[in-house]
Amino acid sequence: MANLNQLSEETRRIFVLADTHDRLPERVKEIAKSADEIWHLGDICAQSILDELRAVGPQVTVVRGNCDSNTDWPLVVDLVRGGLKLRLQHIPPDHSPKDADVVLHGHTHVPRHQKRGSVLFLNPGCVTRANQGAPPSVAWLESADGKLNWKLVSLR
């Protein structure tokens, strides 16, 4: 199995989701099938949901959310893609970290694409319990040669 921190710099299609809260709709699994990687940003809640996601095929990286009881899942995962330092965590930090170019998080159930200082904050929204009028959503992150492309996908 390849070390996720040392994958080639070719374009990678990463399927990003968060806050599934014990539910993984079939549509989400269908969308995820074409991914090179899957990143779940926490609040999976049930191991069976992670098992379903892993059965889709691509490598799955997960971080623990505030509703997750599995202490084997890390709170933070730092990765490098396309020459950029990416931090995956569930709850967004209060301040922009100095050691990351991009922070991907869940928790708020609201999509986010915001630059704070030199750090880009991205949130795919929530699969099952959308907030503040946002529709349920997931996202695609394409990474290559120091560039990112973020595309939100509504599940409505």
Regions found by a protein language model. Name each.
Residues 54, 72-90:
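Metallo-beta-lactamase
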Residues 19, 43, 65, 106-107, ...:
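Active-site glycine-centered loops adjacent to acidic/histidine catalytic or metal-binding residues
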Residues 61, 82-151:
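Conserved beta-sheet core of the metallophosphoesterase superfamily
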Residues 152-156:
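Well-ordered alpha/beta subsegment
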Residues 1-60, 68-75, 134-137, 145:
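N-terminal active-site segment of His-dependent metallophosphoesterases
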Residues 30, 77-79, 95:
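Residue "hotspots" at secondary-structure boundaries inside conserved domains
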